Amino acid sequence: MFLHGKSGQNSVFLHGKNGRNICNGMINRKLDNIIANHYAQQSTALLLSGARQVGKSYAIRKYGQQNYTCFVEVNFIQQPEAIQLFRNAKSVADFLLRLSTFVQQPLVKGETLFFFDEVQVCPDILTWVKFLVESGEYRYALSGSLLGLQLKDIRSIPVGYLSEVEVFPLDFEEFVRAVGVGDATIDA
């Protein structure tokens, strides 16, 4: 059996020795439930950390697009100009005005999820999280890789305003479900 596909996209293509598809499609990840439960039960921002290409960004993007009227994504690697833009903000109102201008779309209070991706290259965003969450107008998600190594020099970690979940590749149960093993076999 061979596993290949586009990493980080929760897509899996499994082929047996004869080349026949065993599984070709989306995988139900436990991470999807973790994200949904977080936003249903907490007002803190959610930070997904972990290795590259394990589905962090995909999971947040999927959740945000399915559950919010307005989903705003800023990727600090693909949009490096955003780093300086946010570094110069003086207040939450100034930060949100800069953000709205940067993404060129209106922000809907109570119905917008902001997703800051690749935060390891913009540690200042973590300092802002406390103040953004306190304002209570929007919801926030962040993701990044190698955060423990990259975020040593953060001015202020937002304790109590940020919930961190470490994301790993598929666990065994997710894998066997992806190849079509049913609940009866798994529960036995």
Predicted regions and their residues:
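Phosphate-binding site recognition
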Residues: 1-188
